Amino acid sequence: MMIWDWNLSKPSESIKKHSGTWDKGIDYKQTYKMFKEDLQKLKNKELLYEDDYKRIAYLITFLFQLRNGCRIWEAIAGMINIAINIDNLNWNERITVKVRTQKRKDWEFRELIIPKCIKKEDIEMVRDVFLDIKKEIDEKLTMDEKLKAKKKIVKRFGAWLYKNYGINTHSLRYAYVTYLGEHGIPAQVLAKITKHKNINYIETYTQSRLAKEILKNIGDLDD
């Protein structure tokens, strides 16, 4: 399978630590259902404008990100790889795609799986949207230009999500982490799934979320 990314040479991006203000505490199941229903509504109507196809492409990408607990660029790169390999994939089985893990200095790839609700015909409908995104990167000549184009694309996706849903892309990643933590998945396994290098961070995050839920839901004797 052909693997594409903006940069497949040795990673050199610096790792930035997040302060935690990005985490909006969104619910995984509610968000998944919301994206899925909005996607279906779009598919059921007559698509007249280019923005309709872009909206479908964006919703597919965010469903993809949410389902895998990945970073937004990993989801975008994953969708591009699916688009360019669409006819070489076995759509009778669950589709997985490899992408380069972002924010890592080591040479690390991860597998992402397409949500069951996303079908081949959905990708075919918006394939050109993802190929155009790929072209935005490929037409740049230097690595600095490619990096700037990548950041611009990520910003565009993030702005669209915030404008339409009031949430940020990183919250989708941690909604999945929280969801798996609620199902008793150990921090070590969570780190492997989401490609977090810092297991202690995952432990602290999931324990903090659990502590908030316990404080909120356990102790009242008024009912």
From Swiss-Prot:
Start and end residues of each Tyr recombinase domain: 29-220
Tree of life domain: Archaea
GO process annotations (BP): chromosome segregation; DNA recombination
Catalytic residues (positions): R71, K103, H170, R173, H196, Y205 (o-(3'-phospho-dna)-tyrosine intermediate)
GO molecular function: DNA binding; site-specific recombinase activity
Record SUPFAM superfamilies: DNA breaking-rejoining enzymes
UniProt keyword list: DNA recombination
The keyword tRNA processing belongs to this UniProt entry's keyword annotation: no
Family designation: Belongs to the 'phage' integrase family.
Protein name per its UniProtKB record: Uncharacterized protein MJ0770
Species annotation: Methanocaldococcus jannaschii (strain ATCC 43067 / DSM 2661 / JAL-1 / JCM 10045 / NBRC 100440)
